[in-house]
Amino acid sequence: MAASSNDASKSAMANSNVTTEVAQTPSKEQDVNGEVEATEEDGANGQLPDNIFQIKIKLPHEPFEIPMTISTAEQVQDLRQSIIEMPNTFQYSCFHLEHKGQRINDFVDLSEVPELGPDSVLEVKEDPYNEKEARLHVIRVRELIGAAGDRTDALHGIMAGLSLHDTVGLDQSGKPKEDGPEQSPLADYDFKSSGAIKNLLPPPQEPAPKCIKSIALSAWNPPPYHLRTKGHLLYLVAMTNENEQHHITSHVTGFYVNKSSNASFDPAPRQGPKALHAHSLLTLLEKLSPSFEASFQQLLEHNAKKELLTIFQLSNAIPANPWLVPPPTSSLTTHQPDLARTQESYLISGVENTDTLRDWNEEFQSTREMPKEAVHDRVFRERLTSKLFADYNDAATRGAMLVARGEIAPLNPTEAKDAQIFVYNNIFYSFGADGVGTFGTEGGDEAARVAVGKDVIGVRAVNNLDIPNLFTSGTVVVDFLGKRIVGQSIVPGIFKQRDPGEHQIDYGAVEGKEIVADDKSFVPLFEQLSKALRVKKHPVWDKDNVRHELEGSVETKGLIGTDGRRYALDLYRLTPLDVAWIEAHWSEPSKDEDAKPSEKNYPHRMATLRPELVESYGRLKLREYVKNEIDKKANKARGGRRRLPKAQKKADAGKEVDGEKKAEAEPEQDRVDISGFSFALNPDVFSGQTPQSDEDKAEWAKDEAEVRAACDHLQTEVIPRMITELKDGEVGFPMDGQSLSSLLHKRGVNIRYLGKIAELSDKPDPRLQALKRLIVQEMIARGFKHFANSKLRNVSAPFSAACVAHLLNCLLGADANAKPVAECDEEIKRMISTPEDDFSFEKLTPESLKKEVIAQIALRYRYDLGESWVESGKELQLLREVSLKLGLQLQTRQYGFTKETLTNGAAVPTPAAPQTNGSSTSSKKKKNKTITPPRADSPAVSLPSQTFHADDILNIVPVIKEASPKSLLAEEALEAGRMSVAQDQKELGQELLLESLQLHEQIYGVLHPEVARAYHTLSNLLFNLDDKASALELAHKAVIVSERTLGVDHADTVLAYLNLGLFEHASGNTKAALVYVRHALELWKIIYGADHPDSITTLNNAAVMLQAMKQYHESRIWFEASLAICEDVSGKTSINTATLLFQTAQALALDKDMRGAVNRMRESYNIFKDVLGAEDRNTKEAESWLEQLTQSAVSQAKQLNDLAKGRIRRIQLTGRNPLRPAAATPSVSDAAAAAGGQRTGTGRVDQRKIEDLLKYIEGESSKTPTKKRTQNPRKRTQKP
């Protein structure tokens, strides 16, 4: 928690440098211990490595001495931070450390402190305060004692960074759900109901104990001049729990109670019993208030119940904003009086506010110039870079929101709105619109909007390449209230007036493409950039047809700043145009402004190929090159045995290679030299360049053919292969719009191809039908987003909630009210509306909105929705997609999407989708009433009966695109660890993985999306290495960090919960595992709806876990549910279905339903026999079981007495661990255990370990039991 205060105080580079550590770990103590544990395993006989040892810290007050384990790899400031955060030393914030009487510099490594070794004594010496230290101390103490209350942050939305991890499995009163002796956590799960939105919110929390009623700056602040010279820094006023008010002076020596009151000013020390003085404000408050110490202890205990990561403040990433939040009346969002809330900006950054003004560009570039030879230099550089980007993104987004709201004066107020530019906090802002006609021929505003989005991606690509001496400006794109705003750090010299004849730009196109500059100093820099990004060196021609050789696109500019650095600007054209798309769907704007033909009216000409596609095409070309080389060699040396060359293998590894992997072999000494291979695309073909010489024309034609071939590769290879993989279950099936987008982008497919993919998916296959439904939903959400933005853009802020509510009613509430009414307050409208406000949204009807959205989909995705519209029962999913895309935060309540649910559900806060209205139990409804009280509408206003009201839109948050680079060092360590594990060097692998983990945490800070992914990956790898305890701990962390940085219902969070369930089960906590699995399934329903194709696996695992708990009847229900989805998705005669029938039969046998078991096993046997043949092992296995089950069914009918005793005869069951990938055989029943659990030769039982199960869940192993290896019915929950 100290993080927030220290974080808040970052002033400049050196200062941010000090505070970066704050975000590193919630408690240094834990981190060091964690490090000790990790290394203990590796050290000989459990000895600690030499650089980790224990020292003593001597304190000026009780307890006077504490032991501490340190690592010499850390800096002194890390140790200082650990002291600040330890419970015994909370009160210290202004101090320095001494060793043997010598002061230690905070900025050196501990290894540089002379004679520091085991059992050394470091002394904490309290320093005199200055004004800044005093302010930070006050902030810190307010945080510590829980007096800071709720912050209203302009950037972070309501409940930003929420985590549900600690409250999963609790009922609405916040207590663990009581399971009867016969019940499991899955007892009342409804497979077909729609998602219950109560699962996205924590239950009401008990309020934290109060240590003090209030503490704030007093009205006598700041000290007058004559008292400043005497060392007075601040005046505070505190109200204790005993209702006593004390005025306190903050002095250079510490804090004391003074003689002031609210009416009279006398800051001299008080006399008598209240004559109290202490160096720390915390100690002074303890002395002042008798109840303080006890309540502070209770507060610490209250906070200790929570997982530290769930309450720690995010400082290196912008927290995720939930799209559903509690109503303002909820106990989760109470608004408390707190005078100091308005004083915080002064406390953080002082009177002049200079602490927060930073020269962003200089910080970015000087960080880039830091040394990166040694590993510790790289760690420090990347850590600083990560922190700097996080601070910049935060500051730039805050400024962009002020620009959007019109709170910053433009630099050019006389120009058109879209052309206005702004500077705030040393960041330059402009609109993502074509204000000055730059993109007139490319599509105007639409082209400009796309260009700035692509520019961010380009800047990120260049940042990741980290080319020495090539610099970029910090770039952030913010979508807020319908406007797109670009924030850039100011490149020195960009606004400089050049002399006549001097160009504004030094490399690339100047003023359109009429003049081309080609400063030679950029050539070596752009050459490295082009090589990495596969950009071909090519000529371009200016308006006088003068030829210029450029390394990059003519659109990519180079500028020599006044600081002498070379900057790359306008990085939106790093890849060629998608010429196939442009020729099919774009036509040049005509001179006389005629409307374009509908088949050629794509909104802009900025349709470029994705960098991933260029890479994929490059790998294809490399394979062709290698194959040709092999053929050449083969022709030279006929008849020799040939081996696949290494280069080929490398090119093939993990890529989309079908048959080529099994290429011919070649003699041992042969290698294919790929140094002769080169592949690059010309980004300027089809962009209006006219080659002059014949040689250039021929080369240009070649370049054009190559780009056409790449476009063809996308349409004929990449997209069809992706659809085939989704159909066959080769890749994880997307859950929502975000996972669908990332699936497409990873394969280099642009979102504009959604319509084409929907057409190709329109086949009878159930998986493809599910894909088509998801794509149609995504197209509707995106079409609606574009239309909603066009309306929101021209509405002033007070009307935005009414506008959004009306648009949502037209989209989703038409069945509930076919004529929704916009809820604009007419009085406010009369008072503040301007001619620029566009209230045309009030006239919209569901029909006109549908027409607009269908037009957007036809325009952008070339897809005719026909009769399809919002799918019945999927309104909640579409509402979620739209809210995430527009940054909406809606009040949590039951939204009725039909007339019935609107009337029935008016007072009931549980959500219910139309088709299951009334299906939830009454007890659930009662429970829910406690979490969300009915809306407190003013009785004077009667609102029309419609799904959404303006009051439901509680907040709109910005949607951010940013360019922060990944840490190469952390990625390299992770990859090295992976490779070592793959090569069976387990100990080395484990060491490298733990090092990678440490690097991720050091560089990014713990709460960061990259760290969430690292936790997820590492937990799986460590689990495979049999380090179950570490894997489980990391799986818990992955869930929390994913929830807080990506969102409580993000697709990655669902996968993290499923992972956690498996690891908990493997560690013997099956009940906890089922709680997490259930939560993941409830989230799945909200994100996707019921029956996701990949949920077969999860239901199957839950069934196996239930068997482990001997909940046989419930287990059977879950197997049957899994089977039902499998029959829908894979068909009734697939191998997958046969496998599940096989397992279900066993579950039925355990549930003593012998007749059902025989029927299911017979179905399984018939499918295996038809598909695989009678001789296949799977068929024989099923046949053997069928015989045994039939005999048991016969004997069961005869011997009802035996059944009453609970014995199932002649079924050979195993007593081994029941959880295995296929759940092929049920766990032992009591009867079989009593009978000794003998096994016959025919009942071969799958005895795979939990590691295999993990592989299966991650999609690496087959779904069928070991005896059924013929075909691989993959069902993965992993993302591709």
Swiss-Prot record:
In its UniProt record, a GO molecular function of this protein is: mRNA binding
Q: Where is the composition biased (Polar residues)?
A: 1-27
Q: Where is the composition biased (Basic and acidic residues)?
A: 649-669, 1245-1261
> Acidic residues: which segments have biased composition?
32-43
Q: Matching Pfam families, A to Z?
A: CLU, CLU_N, eIF3_p135, TPR_10, TPR_12
Q: A Gene Ontology biological process annotation? A: mitochondrion organization
Q: Tell me which residues make up the Clu domain.
A: 338-582
Spell out the Low complexity composition-biased ranges.
1221-1235
What CDD domains has UniProt attached to this entry? CLU-central
Family to which the UniProt record says this protein belongs? Belongs to the CLU family.
Listed under subunit, the entry gives: May associate with the eukaryotic translation initiation factor 3 (eIF-3) complex.
The identity of this protein, by name, is: Clustered mitochondria protein homolog
Source organism of this protein record? Phaeosphaeria nodorum (strain SN15 / ATCC MYA-4574 / FGSC 10173) (Glume blotch fungus)
Q: Which gene encodes it?
A: CLU1
